[in-house]
């Protein structure tokens, strides 16, 4: 199958256009139609000769199909997108007064199987291609009728298990769509060796590490794959990342009532992060059907935050968006084309 055009750089598009016997300026036209106008078929490119459009009409652009979308009261919109093979992912547009953020997925499902995450309970099918990642941003721009300003890789999947496609997508989002690297965040639960590998690209993105526990024993209960990546090794790799990129690391910490939200957990977390160039994002657990964890009360959440700050750790509580439409952090799922949620034992 021909590689989709979406996700290719300006130089790659020039090479393709010239390989078709066309002048280089046609690549500039193609670039504009792909990344500014969001074309879905080459037949739509009206400033190309009709004869050539007909000649290349079967070359895939790489746009996904919007199967359904649902809006929350706060303006958040969740999209269910289907790829060419029928596999689906969810992506979320999160509007604010002066910004529009897209929460993008990097895989169909997720193999990390975190106990408190809906995606982790829905099984894993495959990695997304560069075009499928970039398409999510274009879809949200089209849906909201405004430019996307921020991108967070916090949707379905573990980005560092699809690092090649993610890095190429980052370059397209930055260089071809015009989103600043510092407005892009990549979240990871941690994959041995991959944080250091990401650091070698010297990108100015924000790395967000899903920690969720202050010690290895508790983290292993919440994140089964932590058995391959001791928390001490994870933190050492994060320190290396800070030194290599001169960018601080954000640590994500989902607060689960009675599990990891006690004052002693906050003190233990402060101890392991002391001296770290970092920030802690506290995320009150967003309920998932069939999972026994509970969301702590507001007072408990604020007490945890105060304890971290008291120990000189920069911390803040993330405001939940899209909760009633299951579009909040940890709530995205693999689904069938009908919108039915998938589990690890079912296939779309």
Curated annotation (Swiss-Prot):
Q: Which reaction does it catalyse?
A: adenosine(2503) in 23S rRNA + 2 reduced [2Fe-2S]-[ferredoxin] + 2 S-adenosyl-L-methionine = 2-methyladenosine(2503) in 23S rRNA + 5'-deoxyadenosine + L-methionine + 2 oxidized [2Fe-2S]-[ferredoxin] + S-adenosyl-L-homocysteine; adenosine(37) in tRNA + 2 reduced [2Fe-2S]-[ferredoxin] + 2 S-adenosyl-L-methionine = 2-methyladenosine(37) in tRNA + 5'-deoxyadenosine + L-methionine + 2 oxidized [2Fe-2S]-[ferredoxin] + S-adenosyl-L-homocysteine
Give me the residues that bind [4Fe-4S] cluster, please. Answer: 110, 114, 117
**Enzyme nomenclature, EC number:** 2.1.1.192
A GO biological process held by the record = tRNA methylation
For this chain's record, the cofactor binding note is: Binds 1 [4Fe-4S] cluster. The cluster is coordinated with 3 cysteines and an exchangeable S-adenosyl-L-methionine.
Q: Which domain of life is it from?
A: Bacteria
- Active site as annotated: 90, 329
- Annotated residues that bind S-adenosyl-L-methionine are located at 157-158, 187, 210-212, 286
Q: Which InterPro entries match?
A: Aldolase_TIM (IPR013785), Elp3/MiaA/NifB-like_rSAM (IPR006638), Methyltransferase_A (IPR040072), RlmN_N (IPR048641), RNA_MTrfase_RlmN (IPR027492), rRNA_lsu_MTrfase_RlmN/Cfr (IPR004383), rSAM (IPR007197)
- Indicate yes or no for the key word Transport: no
Q: Which PROSITE patterns match?
A: RADICAL_SAM (PS51918)
- Kindly list the GO CC terms recorded for this protein: cytoplasm
The UniProt entry, under Gene3D superfamilies, shows: 1.10.150.530, Aldolase class I
Major localization class: cytoplasm
Name the family.
Belongs to the radical SAM superfamily. RlmN family.
HAMAP family registered for this protein in UniProt? RNA_methyltr_RlmN
Cite any additional comment in the entry.
Reaction proceeds by a ping-pong mechanism involving intermediate methylation of a conserved cysteine residue.
Q: What is this protein called?
A: Probable dual-specificity RNA methyltransferase RlmN
Q: Which organism is it from?
A: Gloeobacter violaceus (strain ATCC 29082 / PCC 7421)
- The gene name reads rlmN
